[in-house]
Amino acid sequence: MFERFTDKARQAVVLAQEEARRLGHPEVRTEHLLLGLLAVDGESAATRTLTGLGVPLDDLRAEVEERIGRGEGAPSGHLPFAPQNKKVLELSLREALQLGHNYIGTEHILLGLVREAESGAARLLAARGADLNAVRQEVARQLATGAGDRAAAAKPSKEGLIADIEALYDEIGRLSREVHRLTDLLRRHGIEPDQGTSRSA
């Protein structure tokens, strides 16, 4: 269903929701999506781009978490994406099409974040020298060396990619509901999911 997204791009979007829940926020904002990009397993085109711009990833993560703080607790069930974040994913699609790519990778999500200049994530990145022009140039340099999040897929239509993004929202919701169901199941058996220990132990 999500063949247009690279594995790392899908992982970043799912991790964004996990970051929002971990920090006790009621919706997934651009800062959470940035944290999701930073949390992807191993290197990604996005983290290579930021490193190439001299942005220390651990410092950036700490700054993002400090800026958005902790909420009073995320509601149970699916966490919605903030409208600004939906726009970021739409901009990611446009960046992919503009580059002539038949996939959406973490580099395109990063471009979408910085292109939405009024977002919290974009302001944090711009303060560290990672504005739209700088990121575009570094992404181009990374792609020239074959370092993008490439995926083998037939060239899609714009409508097909938009449909994939909408399907991704649905899948995120399904995964969130499943996590919530399993969490409730563990608690009914006296196990706190965060600690993985029984109350009776």
Model-identified regions with their sequence ranges:
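Histone-fold recognition with a strong bias for associated Lys/Arg-rich disordered tails
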Residues: 1-201
